[in-house]
Amino acid sequence: MTFPISKLRVFVIAFFMMASVSVKAQQPGMQALIGQSLSKLQQPTPEAFLNSIAEMKRIDSMFPDSIQPKYQMALQSLNFSVMNPHAAQTDHLLAETEQTIAKMEQMKNSDPSDICTLRGFLFMVCIVQNPVQNGPRYYLNVMQDFEKALKLNPDNQLARQLQQKFLEGMRQQTGNQGE
């Protein structure tokens, strides 16, 4: 009688050990998939961005509780949109990105600095799409989001770079070359 119970215990213990190893192995697997996708952006063509976004969506469906695929999907969507503000896919990508950012905000392991950076970038892309209409509407949002991102994490290089690019672009648009 003890033999079947022992066998069952060994099976249960082995199952839980395999499950824990499998869970830990998912993270490196996810990182490898993300890295492979991003490596294809050596030539940042519109097609390369759209392919990367599609790959990030697949990775996100494989790892729905992870922030990283959502972050990369949003970031690549915004990169595509800022470089192609009037492309047919841009409005759809921006709407999806807004939803992705909202999902990320609800996740317990999200980085508030990254959320602010993405939101600021989203508003920045809206301004690039239509500066006359969206500039006055979103200028303050962009500035506040980048400032908040840098206040939360002074080492956030993406927020710093985007803020600098935004300020340079605004100076060029307003004709104010000095500061």
Language-model regions: role of each:
Residues 94-145:
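Hydrophobic, well-structured mid-protein blocks that either form specific transmembrane helices
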